[in-house]
Amino acid sequence: MSIITTAFALSLLATTAFAVPPETPRIELQAERGLGDQSYAPWQVDCPSNVTWIRNATTGLGTGERAYIEAREKLVQPAIEQMMAARGLETPPRTPVIGVALAGGGYRAMLTGLGGIMGMMNESTEASQSETGGWLDGVSYWSGLSGGSWATGSFMSNGGQLPTTLLENLWNIDSNLVFPDDGKLSFYTNLYTETNAKSDLGFPVQITDIWGLAIGSHVLPEPYQLSNTPNLTFSSLPSVVAALGNASLPMPIIVAAEREAGELVIAENATVWEFTPYEFGSWAFGSQYKSPGAFTPIEYLGTSVDDGSPNGTCWKGFDQLSFVMGTSATLFNGAFLELNGTDSGLLTNLITAFLADLGEDQADISRIPNSFSNYNSGENPIYNLTYITLVDAGETNQNIPLEPLLVPTRDVDAIVAFDSSYDSDYIWPNGTALRTTYERAKILAEHENTRVLMPEVPSMNGFVNGGYNSRPTFFGCNDTTTPVIIYIPSYPWSFAANTSTYQLSYENNEANEMLLNGMRSLTLNHSVPTWPTCFACALTDRSFMYTSENRSTTCQECFDTWCWAGDDNTTEPANYEPVINSVPPWLIANNLSIGMADAPGSNESTAGTASSGAAKMGVGMGMVALTAGLGLML
């Protein structure tokens, strides 16, 4: 491994030898504060006496989340009233709890998911013209996974700005995520400085730290990027971001999955862990056997806790937002598969050897100090672990983070599920994420205290054969025990959005088209006049306690059109190859679409996708740079 590292390091330094980057300014540390207050490293604090270190999941919502949702409801209610009135619909008798869930898939998922969010923002002219803009103001929860967690972190930390504004003024995603166009030496020097400071304190440092810092330096606010002070913690967001401090945005949840000792392939029933600005934990522990989970204050994550009490030394700063985003997106197990298509044999051999060593050393996961050590040892399967080992939750095939929004305690009424998964040969979704969550829900239902409320959905073949993976579909329409899931799959309304998960850079015009196409997957490109009304009906249906017997005529007509009817054609479908700049055939067959010509915005076709040999070579170069930097640090 040292030979590989040396070769990578020399090649990296050779590319920067003729350009001496300017010194990166570092903020002077205040004398009374530890290093971690100003940098990526955690810092030591006095242990507080008024903290509940472990909260059993069966006790309901934590106090921080409960207070946030109560404050959020006061803003959500008038927003929903306004949106319903605009459609000529009745105001719900109670405020519905609405969630959005953004799938994983690297930058593709980040851009497509944020495009979908943009379709719900009244700040977007096109979304407002499409009459879906404004609904984000009625959303209470937002969950993100992998690339969807990048979308979550960037959107929340930047105060809910329009994604196209972030692209224009902040993001530097035209520079390779881990192999920047310039300043490579300063980039890796800063990585070394920040991660070494964390390591010196005795905390584990792995590839996730580097990956997360790289992500943060492309999408987080500039003051918290690697070249400045990368010290934005998840727990500090409500105090740092005014729009979160006053509950003007949905409460963010970022999701990861546990990889148990000895596992190479993550079980679909693996423990799902969630990070919020208030807590870290899981609603259900274990994979083979499920038991009620628990939560700990995320502000003190990294503190050694034994049976609910700290061991004398407490820490803050472990919950760096970049680290949480990196934890949710540990894509490197999948790098083995992607390398099979890399053009350079030498490159493939070098990176494969390095990644193999990482896998053996458990450096390809994220290690979280176990706050639940010796807690509830009779039922807690992680009571004897020093670290909780987390990976990208998409590795469980639950690539849409629905589970946190299906927990009965949160009382979610409707979920808008944005799916940009790489399920098919041509990198389009086929419903795998929803079906996997449905199958997992059956396992969780075996224990009353771990169940989630997931409606039935068709098989993957049924999704494709029914066309459900090409247009919005409502699931759980007449099952009043579950939320209504409004499934929004990515579709090439105006752009070839089926780019590779491992495409590590996007030109700004390409990223802009990705955002617009994601928005049009939700708005249907303003081509279906009844869609805004039907979208409103689905979002609020549960708060009326409607069924097919008492729904309004307007909303029942919508549900007759958009609800899954229970069919499941399990025969092997033909390859799914949607046409760019087209209307989904189902919309045409059902006489719902007025055609693309009447839709606002540019619908110019873009040829090709980013899964070409050149893109794969870019993947390889990014991995070279990343592994080179890691080798210098570990």
Curated annotation (Swiss-Prot):
It is found in: Secreted. N-glycosylated. GO terms for biological process: glycerophospholipid catabolic process. InterPro entries: Acyl_Trfase/lysoPLipase (IPR016035), LysoPLipase_cat_dom (IPR002642). GO terms for cellular component: cytosol; extracellular region. GO terms for molecular function: lysophospholipase activity; phospholipase A2 activity. Belongs to the lysophospholipase family. PANTHER family: CYTOSOLIC PHOSPHOLIPASE A2, LYSOPHOSPHOLIPASE 1-RELATED. This is Phospholipase B.
